[in-house]
Amino acid sequence: MAFKREIHGLVVKKAGDKTATILVERRVMHPRYRKFVKKFKKYLVHDEKNAVKIGDTISAVECRPLSAKKSFRLKAVLKAGVE
């Protein structure tokens, strides 16, 4: 089986039925100043059971493209948010 990329992020939006938007933070070193800088990116995640809420921290795994912008499936809810 091929390696599947796994991402962890914070749910920032419930975008329609069975879809959530998560914000993923990564830290990269600036090439000139050698300081770690936070970079952010949003991903659309498929949530089959509509189980996540805004503020949850989740884990998602890469899958085949489910729509034009959605290529991740919900794996687990790591920490429940406050909503």
Swiss-Prot record:
Pfam families: Ribosomal_S17. It comes from the Bacteria. GO terms for cellular component: cytosolic small ribosomal subunit. Part of the 30S ribosomal subunit. The keyword Ribonucleoprotein applies. One of its GO terms (biological process) is translation. InterPro entries: NA-bd_OB-fold, Ribosomal_uS17, Ribosomal_uS17_bact/chlr, Ribosomal_uS17_CS. GO terms for molecular function: rRNA binding; structural constituent of ribosome. PROSITE patterns: RIBOSOMAL_S17 (PS00056). PANTHER family: 40S RIBOSOMAL PROTEIN S11 FAMILY MEMBER, SMALL RIBOSOMAL SUBUNIT PROTEIN US17M. This is Small ribosomal subunit protein uS17. One of the primary rRNA binding proteins, it binds specifically to the 5'-end of 16S ribosomal RNA. Belongs to the universal ribosomal protein uS17 family. Keywords: Ribonucleoprotein, Ribosomal protein, RNA-binding, rRNA-binding. CDD domains: Ribosomal_uS17.
